Amino acid sequence: MMRSHYCGALNRGNIGQEVTLSGWVHRRRDLGGLIFIDMRDREGIVQVCFDPKYQEALTAAADLRNEFCIQIKGEVTARPGNQINKNMATGEVEVLAKALSVYNASDVLPLDFNQNNTEEQRLKYRYLDLRRPEMAQRLKTRAKITSFVRRFMDDHGFLDIETPMLTKATPEGARDYLVPSRVHKGKFYALPQSPQLFKQLLMMSGFDRYYQIVKCFRDEDLRADRQPEFTQIDVETSFLTAPEVRAIMENMIRGLWLNILGADLGKFPIMTWNEAMTRFGSDKPDLRNPLEIADVADIVKDVDFKVFADPANDANGRVSVIRVPNGASITRKQIDEYTQFVGIYGAKGLAWLKVNDVNAGLEGVQSPIAKFLSEEKIKAIFDRTSAQTGDILFFGADKWQIATDAMGALRLKLGRDLGLTRLDEWQPLWVIDFPMFECDEEGNLAAMHHPFTSPKDFSPEQLEADPTAAVANAYDMVINGYEVGGGSVRIFDPKMQQTVFRILGIDEQQQREKFGFLLDALKFGTPPHAGLAFGLDRLTMLLTGTDNIRDVIAFPKTTAAACLMTEAPSFANQQALEELAITVVTKEE
């Protein structure tokens, strides 16, 4: 037997038992007549004592070094009272080693477990990085999450059905990873950005509750919380309304938090997209932050200050304000830093007003813009914001999108900088009623979610007549400012689907070429259906308390979409390229 117990699972209940442990030397201490090691496996660390009573084991232990892979046979004993370590799960016991075997020695590590290593080092030697207890714990938590999800879905009648990895390229927002076909030269498969169309086809096939924990691929510019390959908890249902789908998924996430963290998320509030953007400047608001954004365009329409008056009188403009309680102590240097910060989001400036005495009107404020405001305007702004003595007001005035994005970002930064965001809380919510379409950079309409999302209470004729007025029957789940999942009611009427395609500039020939199989399937008694998908990586980030998505993936890519350990991507050999009829064209610098 190589192992009878895990190191990290030993406790007082094992005292007196003979055990066989297998794992790694985490740390070694030579105290002259005694040698102690901390021995580690995936479940944790236990202290092992080598005593002269078992001289052969003690002699062999003298040659041990960190990360040797070893086996210990010995007896679990109680630690003396003055040696109990309450910071270790196994801190009340130790193992008296009677026999030691070395499976494998270790070279000097290129990583130092006791210090910060660069992320490049950690990714290059990922198999060593994953030995660290905190990394092992994150992957164990990820496994617990998927195990819980599978049990929940099975208990609620969902079928785990796999969908193809080699499929057809369809426009879903990001670039596809393409796979050349050897058999069909010149043609390519695409790796799926999501199983969206296949899961809808499964609903048309009669499998009314589907789920899958599935890899997805997007060839897009990466951010800190994005990976080229990522994992979704993918869900689709037939004959359920949007509120019914949300209720099931909310129960799953509530159960997940209770199971992993022992935290009760309570009932999730529901907020419209418009309310989220207006009050919080974001479609994924962090409700742990108490600051809110108020609109004051109606108050400042006629002031002699073009910075306010122009956007206030523009149908596409916005003048908004954030009140920071007790913020009057913020220095001019800090205000300048915040002004620079909102510039990142396109804002041309940041007006401010300190409330030294809320009852003194203009006499009680300090601000470069005070000269443009009357007593009546000041009072109206105070009433709108519930301003109090000692507060500071920050104003954003610009085109609606710029002002909203800038003030939303400023709200988050102020919450962090001033310690206002309650970091010990969980604040989930649903955001619903998104616009059906948004304008892209060229001014063309694009689907805010994807082109298979159904509008709310719109006929095809109404949608074609006024597409920008349509509200999508879509919903996102947000927790602490992170969008953890999103979905929608799907289009199940072929006429509506073709209407949406036309609005998006996809003509009939392109519709047949790209989506002919879907349009055909919609003709044969398609049921009403709805679904959503959760980002497993992001859920795991939240549940393990890390802000780096690479911490919760066993073998992640860098922000340049490279694997430093295997050195992927790599060049293909010439024979393989010839079989695929591919010629590599290199551009000169």
Swiss-Prot record:
InterPro entries per UniProt: Aa-tRNA-synt_II, aa-tRNA-synth_II, aa-tRNA-synth_II/BPL/LPL, Asp-tRNA-ligase_1, Asp-tRNA-ligase_1_N, Asp/Asn-tRNA-synth_IIb, AspRS_core, GAD-like_sf
EC annotation from Swiss-Prot or TrEMBL: 6.1.1.12
Binding site for L-aspartate: 172, 218, 449, 490
Residues annotated as binding ATP: 218-220, 227, 483, 535-538
Molecular-function annotations in GO: aspartate-tRNA ligase activity; ATP binding; nucleic acid binding
Gene3D superfamilies linked: Bira Bifunctional Protein, Domain 2, GAD-like domain, Nucleic acid-binding proteins
Compartment list: Cytoplasm
Principal EC category: ligase
Superkingdom classification of source: Bacteria
Location (main, coarse): cytoplasm
GO BP annotation list: aspartyl-tRNA aminoacylation
A GO CC annotation given for this chain: cytoplasm
Alphabetical UniProt keywords: Aminoacyl-tRNA synthetase, ATP-binding, Cytoplasm, Ligase, Nucleotide-binding, Protein biosynthesis
Reactions performed catalytically: tRNA(Asp) + L-aspartate + ATP = L-aspartyl-tRNA(Asp) + AMP + diphosphate
Region (Aspartate) residue spans: 196-199
The protein's assembly and partners: Homodimer.
Family named by the database record: Belongs to the class-II aminoacyl-tRNA synthetase family. Type 1 subfamily.
Stated role: Catalyzes the attachment of L-aspartate to tRNA(Asp) in a two-step reaction: L-aspartate is first activated by ATP to form Asp-AMP and then transferred to the acceptor end of tRNA(Asp).
PANTHER family documented for this protein: ASPARTATE--TRNA LIGASE, MITOCHONDRIAL, ASPARTYL/LYSYL-TRNA SYNTHETASE
Protein name from the UniProt record: Aspartate--tRNA ligase
Species: Actinobacillus succinogenes (strain ATCC 55618 / DSM 22257 / CCUG 43843 / 130Z)
Gene behind the chain: aspS
